[in-house]
């Protein structure tokens, strides 16, 4: 790759059709696990003009009003205007749910699993809920150890939502997207090439009715109230060469489920690293913690983040894979892209010895079953928009760096030699 290149990542707001589905799916997860932490949940949601369909496989003792949950989440997002073609009060909500397949359950369910703390033998007895491969990544481009492009794209969308919900820009509507292109030199971010924002808006703004004037007003406001606050204290800022694009089609009045059908699990790159790292293909939202697509991807992020936080590497990508019904990973790989300061073979061995990667162990260490109940019925839905990883606004167990000292001690002679 050239020493100078551009890299782009995108994000979407919580009002994007696919993200509505992710949030409803994870709201269902929260509600069920808060009542019955041993539940098995695979909740899929589809939204279209005036319609919500909740489907999937759920095995639980919890009593949940799925229709009420969906309507409340839709209202919280901001779909309360009937003229948008989709609103919490007027949309139809259909529910079509089955129980989890007995063939799948037999490889995962064990009597010991209902206890809080499991022995080594019991951890080995609880298999993965499916086969699959998962990735986790961290790099030192941002304080939260995430790639800069996706970090900024999420910040733009979160600020876009904030100015809408506070009424600062009352003409904005819930649907929106961002895209940020970063200039890199020798593998390090050095500039902001392009900032793109597409945001749904009302047909007129106050007395402004001309389309060109409306778009000019939106562009001016978004720079002042969205872009400038984000970059106020940033080390890398937009400059006179930075392109700022807003609603490039010239109009974005029809949006949300009226404009596009939405489906759970279609924003997996936005949920993770913005394309900067590889992805195993499995979505997160709507899945209980026994699904390794979700829990093991969180564990991979935890490993990668601790390695970078310990300054053992500038970049780190972790891959693990599982077989259905088998507790221990089939394979594990650590890639540091030539930035490792320690022996990579030893690094892999140290990680295997000190990080729990059996599904029941991940669930136990991160407390993934009990967090919805402990946090008032709200945990997974909060990561269903604006990224599951690198969230500085949330207390997430997989974002902790509590293994840093252990890793440093394991490599202290090598690190001292490298420093000298």
From Swiss-Prot:
Pfam families on file: S-AdoMet_synt_C, S-AdoMet_synt_M, S-AdoMet_synt_N
Keywords: ATP-binding, Cytoplasm, Magnesium, Metal-binding, Nucleotide-binding, One-carbon metabolism, Potassium, Transferase
Protein name: S-adenosylmethionine synthase
Main localization category: cytoplasm
Keyword Magnesium: yes
InterPro entries reported for this sequence: ADOMET_SYNTHASE_CS, S-AdoMet_synt_C, S-AdoMet_synt_central, S-AdoMet_synt_N, S-AdoMet_synthetase, S-AdoMet_synthetase_sfam
One Gene Ontology biological process: S-adenosylmethionine biosynthetic process
Binding site for L-methionine: 57, 100, 260, 291
